[in-house]
């Protein structure tokens, strides 16, 4: 079993994700191996809120080049978490 803090890596703060907070949706960067039920349990455990829905997006790593050497940035996974009306996550409030 994975720990909740291993599944949720960090909150995603962007213009689009901040506009989603008005609709009670919060965006996180999560472990690429985590599934929706693990993400739901982790958010409920850490922030003490009720999650209604979890949508996930897999972001492919971009190709990077340093002189003649080609490489790739790692793939990431985003999760958009919809909360019950009335619930809030405080880390998104002051931004």
UniProtKB/Swiss-Prot annotation:
Classification via InterPro entries: Nucleotide-bd_a/b_plait_sf, Ribosomal_uL23-like, Ribosomal_uL23/eL15/eS24_sf
BP GO terms, sorted: translation
Lineage top rank: taxon: Bacteria
GO cellular component, as recorded: ribonucleoprotein complex; ribosome
GO function terms (MF aspect): rRNA binding; structural constituent of ribosome
Keywords attached to this entry: Ribonucleoprotein, Ribosomal protein, RNA-binding, rRNA-binding
Subunit structure: Part of the 50S ribosomal subunit. Contacts protein L29, and trigger factor when it is bound to the ribosome.
Family: Belongs to the universal ribosomal protein uL23 family.
Annotated function: One of the early assembly proteins it binds 23S rRNA. One of the proteins that surrounds the polypeptide exit tunnel on the outside of the ribosome. Forms the main docking site for trigger factor binding to the ribosome.
NCBIfam families membership: PRK05738.1-3, PRK05738.2-4, PRK05738.2-5
Name this protein carries in UniProt: Large ribosomal subunit protein uL23
Gene: rplW
């Amino acid at each position: 079993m994975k720990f909740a803090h291993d599944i949720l890596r960090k909150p995603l703060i962007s213009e689009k994700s901040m506009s989603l907070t008005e609709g009670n949706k919060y965006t996180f960067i999560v472990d690429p191996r985590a599934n929706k039920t693990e993400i739901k349990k982790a958010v409920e455990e850490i922030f003490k809120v009720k999650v209604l829905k979890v949508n996930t997006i897999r972001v492919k790593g971009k190709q990077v080049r340093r002189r003649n050497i080609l490489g790739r940035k790692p793939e990431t996974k985003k999760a958009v978490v919809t909360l019950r009306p009335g619930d809030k996550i405080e880390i998104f409030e002051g931004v």
